[in-house]
A protein has these predicted regions:
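C-terminal extensions of enzymes
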Residues: 327-369
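Shared catalytic-loop signature of beta/alpha-barrel
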Residues: 207, 213, 224-239, 246-343
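Structured beta-strand/loop patches that form or line metal/cofactor-binding pockets in enzymes
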Residues: 1-40, 45-53, 325-330
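Metal-dependent enolase-superfamily TIM-barrel catalytic cores that perform enediolate-based chemistry
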Residues: 124-236
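Metal- or metallocofactor-binding catalytic centers and their adjacent structured scaffolds
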Residues: 37-114
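Glycine-rich phosphate/pyrophosphate-binding beta-alpha loops
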Residues: 14, 48-56, 95, 136-140, ...
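Conserved, mostly hydrophobic/aromatic
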Residues: 3, 34, 41, 70, ...
Length: 369
């Protein structure tokens, strides 16, 4: 089963509303679809969605890398030897995790379709047939709009992730308190700071974090502030998750050794694909650190891969964020994600178990705009 072609398709995709987190405002998304075909006609799909919070890659650089590095390296090689193919890529690509993630996903999809089994089976087997997901309430300067969004999403999700860090600490905490007052004591709340606080900000916030009843504090401090975050973990009675500070398996090892978090977010794009994400999750679990699966708000292909990854993990400490296609105006798969009882089903079809809409890819191709 030789690889016959590797293509990159940049998309002009947009969100239903502006999504704000950290220092980023996103109304459009730089997705790139990677399509790999074999000489016997099997096709697999992957998706890159490079965002500046995690990588220097751009939509244009992903396309260039696929065309000038990935395709020449993979075409003519045996697709069934996935790990050796990833090792081949590691030799020709420098730090390009989102590009590698798309290729890794496409190879897994291709192999699953060829074998007639779901990707979760290729990752070792599925521990669950559905994955709990959480709502995501984007940051807004107006607390009333934050509350409105939280109440709307509370109708669907048990857990809500809120965002803070863009404003003065007390004003951000006032927004979180307003949400708590609106949704009531039974809603499960987590907050993502995206590394926007300094150590003094985090210390100031400790008492109010407890009073608001937040259960998870994600990436309170920026990468590089691990000694301070270790102290924060020791002082807080709730979980602290590492996200931006875990961009490799080695980073997961560092979290375990230094105890700078009690949970690791193993988003597959930032880590360089499902293979690396699975390894990071295994490292964390072996070291007594919890695991959650996040995303960078990808479309249907990467989200389907995330569901298979989450299904293949024995223990998930928190709900996953894997229904982000619902945030988009456009869809690229025939199947639409359905959230039922705060869960999303994992497809049991071959490969990713999705049908990619080639007409939609042609329509959204940024090169045709």
């Amino acid at each position: 089963m030789k690889i016959a072609s590797v293509e990159a398709i940049p998309l002009a995709a947009s969100f239903k509303q502006v999504f704000r987190f950290g220092t980023i405002d996103r109304s459009t998304s730089p997705n790139v679809i990677v399509r790999i075909a074999t000489d016997d006609g099997v096709v697999g799909y992957g998706e890159a969605c490079p965002v500046q919070a995690f990588t220097s890659e751009t939509q244009a650089s992903v396309v260039e890398l696929v065309e000038t590095r990935v395709a020449p390296t993979l075409v003519g090689r045996d697709a069934s030897q996935r790990l050796p193919r990833l090792a081949d890529l590691a030799r020709v690509l420098r730090f390009a995790p989102f590009t590698i993630a798309a290729v890794d996903t496409a190879l897994l999809d291709l192999l699953g379709r060829h074998a007639g089994v779901p990707v979760a089976t290729l990752l070792g087997g599925a521990f669950r047939d559905r994955v709990e997901v959480h709502g995501s309430v984007t940051w807004d300067e107006d607390p009333a709009r934050v509350v409105e969004s939280a109440l709307e999403q509370r109708e669907t999700y048990r857990w809500l992730k809120l965002y803070a860090g863009r404003d003065e600490v007390d004003r951000d905490l006032d927004r979180l308190q307003a949400v708590r007052d609106a949704v009531g004591p039974d809603a499960r709340l987590m907050v993502d700071i995206n590394g926007m606080w300094g150590p003094s900000d985090a210390i100031r916030a400790l008492d109010r974090i407890r009073a608001i009843g937040l259960e998870l504090l994600e990436q309170p401090l920026p990468p590089g502030a691990e000694p301070f975050q270790r102290d924060l973990v020791a002082r807080l009675a709730i979980d602290v998750a590492a996200d931006e500070s875990v961009r490799s398996v080695a980073d997961a090892v560092s979290v375990v050794r230094q105890r700078t978090a009690t949970v690791v977010n193993v988003g597959l794009s930032k880590l360089g694909g499902p293979t690396a994400a699975l390894q990071a999750a295994q490292v964390a679990a072996a070291g007594g650190v919890g695991v959650m699966v996040g995303s960078v708000i990808e479309m249907g292909i990467a989200s389907a891969m995330g569901l298979h990854l989450a299904a293949a993990l024995p223990h998930l400490a928190y709900p996953s964020y894997l229904m982000s296609p619902l945030k988009y105006r456009e869809q690229i798969t025939a199947e639409q994600i359905a959230v039922v009882d705060a869960h999303v089903a994992v497809s049991t079809g071959p490969g990713l178990g999705i049908e990619v809409d080639e007409d939609a890819l042609r329509h959204l191709d940024a090169r045709r705009r």
